[in-house]
Amino acid sequence: MLEYLLLLISTVLVNNFVLVKFLGLCPFMGVSKKIEPAVGMGLATTFVLTLTSAFAYLVQHYLLVPLAAESLSTLAFILVIAVVVQFTEMVIHKSAPDLYRILGIYLPLITTNCIVLGLALLNITMQHNFMQSVVYGFGGGLGFMLVLILFASLRERLAAADVPAPFQGIAIGMVTAGLMSLAFLGFTGLIKL
């Protein structure tokens, strides 16, 4: 049990996919202007990452490995991701139409978000078992949601600040993301797995 907790904390803080591995930067910059869509996108991505991790593990170990078709893992994972994202989109559309409208094009774009495919491939590379894969996916989603909400709150404050003209817009966003990345590097060495 402690192993799973350490893996979760490590994935959220120490090895954050956005700020340390630089995966998922498109939605990180695109959906982080306001906190509400950031929370919705974070929850949707966490849901997708957790389910994708579970299904990618099952496809890899119970379909591809027995058929000696490991070379098709990337293609198989893309199909798994597409199905999970479509399912997530239907659930959000039925249960939270306002969130569905706010997320707009970013919801189906989770399919092409490199964090989702990267996580599935990293699970296989790191040889995680089923529970480790699910925890790694959940932790990756929580880490993504954490930095997305933090970044959105900072961008809301920056929108009200007196930022010099050359730094307005995306420039101050990149500087802020860089400073956040440096702050998260402070967690390095916190957990040794």
UniProtKB/Swiss-Prot annotation:
It is an enzyme of class 7 (translocase). The chain crosses the membrane at residues 5-25, 39-59, 72-92, 102-122, 134-154, 170-190. Keywords: Cell inner membrane, Cell membrane, Electron transport, Membrane, Translocase, Transmembrane, Transmembrane helix, Transport. It comes from the Bacteria. The keyword Nucleotidyltransferase does not apply. Its main location: membrane. It is found in: Cell inner membrane. It holds the Pfam family Rnf-Nqr. GO terms for cellular component: plasma membrane. One of its GO terms (biological process) is electron transport chain. It is a multi-pass membrane protein. Its EC number is 7.-.-.-. PANTHER family: INTEGRAL MEMBRANE PROTEIN OF SOXR-REDUCING COMPLEX, ION-TRANSLOCATING OXIDOREDUCTASE COMPLEX SUBUNIT A. Part of a membrane-bound complex that couples electron transfer with translocation of ions across the membrane. The complex is composed of six subunits: RnfA, RnfB, RnfC, RnfD, RnfE and RnfG. NCBIfam families: PRK05151.1, rnfA. Belongs to the NqrDE/RnfAE family. This is Ion-translocating oxidoreductase complex subunit A. It comes from Tolumonas auensis (strain DSM 9187 / NBRC 110442 / TA 4). The lineage of its organism: Bacteria, Pseudomonadati, Pseudomonadota, Gammaproteobacteria, Aeromonadales. The gene is rnfA.
